[in-house]
From Swiss-Prot:
This is Chaperone protein ClpB. Residues 160-341 are annotated as: NBD1. The Clp repeat (R) domain probably functions as a substrate-discriminating domain, recruiting aggregated proteins to the ClpB hexamer and/or stabilizing bound proteins. The NBD2 domain is responsible for oligomerization, whereas the NBD1 domain stabilizes the hexamer probably in an ATP-dependent manner. The movement of the coiled-coil domain is essential for ClpB ability to rescue proteins from an aggregated state, probably by pulling apart large aggregated proteins, which are bound between the coiled-coils motifs of adjacent ClpB subunits in the functional hexamer. It comes from the Bacteria.
Amino acid sequence: MDAELTNRSRDALNAATTRAVSAGNPDLTPAHLLLALLEGQDNENLVDLLAAVERRPGGGSARAPSASLGSLPGVTGSTVAPPQPNRDLLAVIADAGRRAKDLGDEFLSTEHLLIGIRPTARPPRCSPGRAPTPEKLLEAFQNTRGGRRVTTPRPEGQYKALEKFGTDFTAAARERKLDPVIGRDQEIRRVVQVLSRRTKNNPVLIGEPGVGKTAVVEGLAQRIVKGDVPESLKDKRLVSLDLGAMVAGAKYRGEFEERLKTVLSEIKESDGQIVTFIDELHTVVGAGAADSAMDAGNMLKPMLARGELRMVGATTLDEYRERIEKDPALERRFQQVLVAEPSVEDSIAILRGLKGRYEAHHKVQIADSALVAAATLSDRYITSRFLPDKAIDLVDEAASRLRMEIDSSPLEIDELQRSVDRLKMEELALDRETDPASRQRLEKLRRDLADRERSCAAHRPWEKEKQSLNRVGELKERLDELRGQAERAQQHGDFDTASKLLYGEIPTLERDLRWRPAEEEAAKDTMVKEEVGPDDIADVVGSWTGIPAGRLLEGETQKLLRMEAELGRRLIGQSEAVQAVSDAVRTRAGIADPDRPTGSFLFLGPTGVGKTELAKALADFLFDDERAMIRIDMSEYGEKHSVARLVGAPPGYVGYEEGGQLTEAVRRRPYSVVLLDEVEKAHPGVFDILLQVLDDGRLTDGQGRTVDFRNTILVLTSNLGSQYLVGSAPEEEKRRQVMEVVRSSFKPEFLNRLDDLVIFSALDEDELARIAGLQIAGLARRLADRRLSLDVTPEALAWLAKEGFDPAYGARPLRRLIQTAIGDRLAKEILAGEVRDGDTVRVDRVEDGLLVGRAEG
């Protein structure tokens, strides 16, 4: 008997035996088996079978025999023999075996047992008319398995396999569960053309992640439902297969192959009525291929080649190259359909089409300007992802954030309400007291309570506005639901219902929705923000990229017009350099070549004159953050073998997985100033790499990824020829000598690709005095954190400028002088307790230097 049982039948008998042992029953009865069948794992097929017969969930039947188990005789003791099948159970198994033989089945399945067990285990007080008869169960069983025979020990997983492992896109389209598909007409038409072929009618959608490959398939499903397809595709079902669900739970060898074979058989038996879709098509290569088993790709090949299986696949360019192209026999059975990234204008159109769905889901309004901002800002600032997916995510997150703010009570209202509740409890306690002090406290408390209740009443409009907004959201949801009902009624030919909806209820709801915003517009002072605007989109972009939201919306022209003034505040004595950089950045922003960096400069000059400071000021001005500067010391790249560190080690070398120092930094922060310090010390191979960046605005790293440099400003610094700049020769002669040195050191093709060569002049004493003022102001800000004030006399400032002046070293000696003459002395006085928090520190000129101490009075 064991040899003829399926795995689940054997498990059910073992579970029934265990149940009988735990209950102390000496006999194994049909009631034990029925309970084991209906309460066991993986019993969906039996529950569905009972539900089909009884027209109700099958779980109700599982409770009936459990009540009758208590009436069975029980035994106790340590030498109790294991329970044996009684006469009724043996008759059930024999009857099930006969039925299996009559049906041509090779194994005894759980369904055979259920058909045989049902009459003998009928619960007490259950009328014969309500209990399913064996004939009804047998009829339902034959309908469920669709004429297939039980020829394996695991047949239960093969019934309704397509329903279990697939999602019907056409059914979802009929129920309006799919988002509308805007555009993509050319791609959908191409898919229809391939599907209409006689053989190899299998299109594969290839494109970057997020460009809308699955949306093309959803658009095809919607067209099939509307009948907007050729005759060869009319009334077809588009079913998405879930390979992950097929692999999941396949415990035994060959179980995955059986599941897939059953699905393919169902598709074949549909006689071309089913078109399948596999998202992430590359997963079929190797899926289920454990222990030398055949993978899904090899099982699909014969049907794909003969045209028995019409399949639509979707995968990314990289995965297609790495997985599908390596199997030419599989690749030739598919026809490529490229899905390109839509333009910003097309993305805005897509967002407008989806706007209603997101408004209904989040119950907020979404301004059209927010949609435009989402498409433009995501295209400009989120370069690692693709439209329209990134723009849709921006709108979704901004609407979600606004919904969360609406649902959350404002902090001040919440605190007011809590304080009112606390004061009311105090009032009840004080009201019982009779002494004068308590009565006085009670009067004061009641006055305070009245004030707070008035404040709470002033905030009640917030609740009213919130309720009104929720009502608008409910109206939108209802409107969306009615439109779906009208669409389904038209598809089924119920024009009476469709006309009632289209010309009755829907126009009424639309009027209500138009009237409510007009009413709310009249009341300008609203406490609840109900519309997603460009500011909200910019906030989300800022949280994703780290770029401040205010700068995202500020006009480029306004920002760049004040560039010299902003940079000039930080950089003293280099007006020509500031002017040259500002002009170059403005020119590139105005008539920008989209395939080059925003700016590329070579800063030349002696040490300490502000080359690095200008790069920091650029990062702060353009990106609101000094840390938006990627600084690489080129003296570390003087050896030939170290050049590869910039872009990452090639495959097979140590450090391949880590990426490049330059490429990884720019990939993580594409909007930044890249400072390559002391570039003349780098190996000549570095400049060959930089040629590609300066010319094309892109660089390929060691792992084959293309890194975008188009939004960076490239700054290279060098001390070449600085000895000529500190001399007394005329300015033009100095510049000529510097340029001769530069031309002899760098290749012409490198210099020719730079936007500008900026020469920094040496600082004079007046400029150093102004720099001293900036340094002192920085020290004062640091002292303010300790609540100390700094007062430096003009005489002390002049002494600092004079003593710190050294044309050969620029402003760095001044910084060291301020640290030693003021900073170090002040630190000693703070540690000694001579200067305390809140004091004013005075710095004055004396004969032998500076006097630093606490100001008197």
